[in-house]
């Protein structure tokens, strides 16, 4: 392998590594955003003045109409 080929391989390898590092950082930022959104939702739930009700059952709601 010539010196020129080694230099080209090194350059391409550096480009690949840089691209993968950028992708990894983007994923970390996305995970951070999701975690922050979850934390915000959790804090909103903690300050609600009433507990959330259980989901309504269709039959319980419409039973009088049967």
Curated annotation (Swiss-Prot):
It is found in: Secreted; Nucleus; Cytoplasm; Mitochondrion membrane. InterPro entries: Clusterin-like. Pfam families: Clusterin. One of its GO terms (cellular component) is extracellular region. Its main location: secreted. Keywords: Chaperone, Cytoplasm, Cytoplasmic vesicle, Disulfide bond, Endoplasmic reticulum, Glycoprotein, Membrane, Microsome, Mitochondrion, Nucleus, Secreted, Ubl conjugation. The keyword Secreted applies. The keyword Chaperone applies. Proteolytically cleaved on its way through the secretory system, probably within the Golgi lumen. Proteolytic cleavage is not necessary for its chaperone activity. All non-secreted forms are not proteolytically cleaved. Chaperone activity of uncleaved forms is dependent on a non-reducing environment. Polyubiquitinated, leading to proteasomal degradation. Under cellular stress, the intracellular level of cleaved form is reduced due to proteasomal degradation. Belongs to the clusterin family. This is Clusterin. It comes from Ovis aries. The lineage of its organism: Eukaryota, Metazoa, Chordata, Craniata, Vertebrata.
């Amino acid at each position: 392998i010539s010196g020129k080929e080694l230099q080209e391989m090194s350059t391409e390898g550096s480009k690949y590594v840089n691209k993968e590092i950028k992708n990894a950082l983007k994923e970390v930022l996305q995970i951070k955003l999701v975690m922050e959104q979850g934390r915000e939702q959790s804090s909103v739930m903690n300050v609600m003045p009433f507990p959330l009700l259980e989901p309504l059952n269709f039959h319980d709601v419409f039973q009088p109409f049967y």
